[in-house]
Amino acid sequence: MVPVKVMELVGASPNGWRSAVQAAVDEAKKTAGEIVGVEVVNFTAAVENGQVTEYRANVKIAHR
């Protein structure tokens, strides 16, 4: 069994939750080793004038 570390991040994007998750993964790649998995914990969004302006994804990223 190979141990993994887990970091928690919030990714954000104006283009959707998938892009928000990818933004978190991209940020994690800057400091983490090999990323082996992502757990999406929560989705939220910012709203202005009745329109979604930013999608946010709280994620846990497993890495070696």
Annotate each language-model stretch with its function:
Residues 1, 32, 49-53:
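A generic structural signal for short, solvent-exposed coil/turn residues
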Residues 39, 43-64:
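A cross-kingdom feature marking charged/low-complexity
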